[in-house]
Regions:
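N-terminal glycine-rich phosphate/pyrophosphate-binding loop and immediately adjacent elements
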Residues: 2-120, 124-127
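Conserved redox-cofactor binding core of oxidoreductases
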Residues: 106-179
Length: 179
């Protein structure tokens, strides 16, 4: 079926976490959705599972593309152009913003204005997303995590021994690591 042979209710640009979630929710409501992605689907091969190949070796990062930092200096973007977008390199971590993240924030460069919505208004949508993505966790492990109306549906995965060692060292130094 050609794209122009059909009427779409919505066109979503980008098949990463946000775009794919939006397309999924709209299609569940019976809407015709066209999802446009600049990258292709990653072939199912071992080098597309390895974080080293995907992130450190920049296998799917844009070649020859530079973005500009606040000082105007160019830097290579840490992004992936593929179906799924940066979910290919994000480590499957889905954190909620903190309550204070929604407030006005003074920075060296100026003031970042407050969001037009609050954490409390976003909380039901966090619940929906966490349920849809089957997020694992336990409230209270991260001492900075905001309040939640429901506990995680899925318990956290056990911490791997090497990460437990790192966690212990960081805690001895007064840090608050969590997994």
């Amino acid at each position: 079926m050609l794209i122009d042979d059909h009427h779409y209710d919505f066109i979503v640009v980008g098949g990463g976490a946000s775009g794919a979630t939006l397309a999924h929710q709209l299609s569940k409501k019976g809407k015709w959705v066209l999802l446009l992605e600049r990258g292709g689907q990653l072939p199912p091969e071992e080098t597309n599972i390895s974080g080293t190949d995907l992130f450190r070796k920049t296998r799917y990062h844009p070649k020859g593309e530079n973005w500009l930092g606040p000082d105007g200096d160019p830097f290579p973007p840490q992004t992936v152009y593929a179906l799924g977008g940066n979910t290919k390199i994000w480590g499957s971590v889905l954190q909620r913003m903190r309550m204070e993240d929604f407030n006005e924030l003074p920075l060296q460069e100026g003031i970042s204005p407050s969001w037009p919505i609050s954490y409390e208004e976003m909380e039901p949508y966090y619940e929906l997303a966490e349920k849809m993505y089957k997020v694992k966790g336990k409230h209270g492990i991260d001492k900075t995590e905001p309040n939640r109306s429901l506990e995680y549906e899925n318990p956290p995965k056990p911490i791997e021994p090497i990460f437990k060692e790192i966690q212990n060292v960081l805690e001895e130094e007064g840090c608050n690591p969590y997994y």
